[in-house]
């Protein structure tokens, strides 16, 4: 396939160096709900005096029907499509000559579905012996479990290694391997013909929830497997759920798991590609026609659910729980899926925002997903690209994970700079504390400039996460290397040549202040 390589090469370097967040979408099993109309949620008024909350954070478009959602996506695509598709959003399609346009069929998700083993009635798991101590996964918040490859409740140890789940009984004080389940074996066919390389799990009272992330024939895939633990010598998968999308992470509160996925189904749209500059107008026209003819299935990720009763498939998107920023933020779909481990793998609740998703943090009631601001680098010249990259912002989406609906989108906000990891976020008394670093020299092509870090305190007002307090000027010329929040105190470590430790009093959310500083040479 011949490809034109021109000025896009420089922009491609910008994209690969800066990177942009991925995103995901979701829909519950069965039919997709829909009523006509779309509404604007939240206000657009920025917070004054404490830095901008960002237009992205306010005025999210809420869709009440699939027609409204599809119309929004197609309108955004028609505004941005060119002879090379959606600015290199993935598959480029076939060459287009001056007198012909080649058509390519859209790749579909593999439809093979092997019968899952019959479910076994689960027996209650043994309670750990009083006074017996055992280690658990290192978690950020008490009561909020995080996925791991080893889990224990004091009586049993589950180990997930290279696609095999091992059940070890330790109730007698000595380890006894009772059984295992091979996810890759031809007999089980739990993981089929895909390249899954990331495995994690949660341990519930009667079952284990295995989560696999990897690549399939149509891009990123996430597979969730529920394993019945009632008969350790005959472990059996009772249900599996395979979804188009990249697995970001998950959290477990009680028996309810919240999974975060980012999907890019738009990459499979069969845009054509010009074989010469004179063919560009024809290619752009063909790509516009392609967008106009797309359906919801072309833009939304799909899922396949399998259990002893057979397989079902559908779109992983609930249009009634889908949102898009008023400021366009890409065609990725950020999805939060709620699963009840006690009730099996049923797509009970899913909420979607058209945005990226990179870092997650959860309290016992709320889940936050952070991603760096999306920029259409291909639409910018060199000076515009430098200006955008010098003003790094991180956007944060808040979801309720404690309500009766399983998961519900609440609000969005933004802070200057980028986050180190999940520990850069912490919720306390209804406020979200966020530590970030703003580095104008981030990237080899940018101008020199001092980096500086800060801690912002955000509170929800309607659909907005607004900054109500800030403390800045932390470690000028340095970046954050470690963060911890403990109650009303925050600890931030920055580093370049020295290793400063800042102690921050957060007892007054509207007036955070540095109360201690230690520099280690």
PLM feature spans:
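Beta-sheet-rich non-transmembrane sensory/scaffold domains
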Residues: 18-521
